[in-house]
């Protein structure tokens, strides 16, 4: 599976299929008042209250017949390794729920992660690490593509500017390919 990331300056909220929102331990969504979703805040809060007691990192529910919300519970003071693990478990969650396209909003990320500017890079780095699969010798290859749209209206997010994460992904995937390759006997 591959992950395609697009930075968008302008987005039509009605065309967004799946919203990904980060929230605290109590599922309080930061930056919610700046989003298009604030119109349906009472329904969203009711769904959160119904599922609040469940010890899950992610909540998925429908807003209407064509749109879903995925809430990601993030604890304060996460280290970069924990952010990567959260991204990896999020990848596993969306893959198991067949959610292949979703949108992340900078207003949500900006208010929630003002201390760690690299949070989104670390989170998506974990997703990319988890998405690796060795299918060189498979006859039926998995061609699913995860599409992530990052709405960056205020140019707050410097996503992708740090090439360290891309270099790590390439090196780790090459190493995994070499380890998975059968030996020459």
Regions flagged by a language model, labelled:
Residues 1-185:
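Short amphipathic alpha-helical segment within the helicase RecA-like ATPase core
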């Amino acid at each position: 599976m591959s992950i395609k990331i697009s930075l968008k300056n302008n987005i039509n909220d009605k065309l967004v299929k799946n919203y990904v929102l980060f929230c605290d331990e109590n599922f309080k969504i930061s930056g919610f008042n700046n989003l298009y979703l604030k119109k349906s805040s009472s329904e969203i809060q009711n769904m959160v209250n119904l599922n609040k007691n469940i010890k899950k990192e992610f909540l998925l529910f429908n807003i209407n017949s064509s749109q879903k919300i995925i809430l990601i519970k993030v604890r304060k003071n996460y280290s970069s390794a924990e952010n990567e693990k959260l991204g990896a478990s999020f990848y596993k969650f969306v893959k198991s729920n067949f959610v292949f396209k979703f949108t992340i909003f900078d207003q949500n990320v900006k208010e929630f992660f003002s201390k760690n500017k690299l949070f989104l890079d670390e989170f998506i780095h974990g997703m990319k690490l988890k998405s690796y699969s060795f299918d060189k010798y498979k006859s039926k290859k998995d061609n699913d593509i995860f599409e992530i749209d990052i709405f960056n209206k205020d140019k707050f997010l410097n996503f992708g500017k740090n090439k360290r994460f891309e270099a790590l992904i390439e090196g780790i995937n090459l190493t995994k390919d070499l380890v998975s390759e059968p030996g020459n006997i």
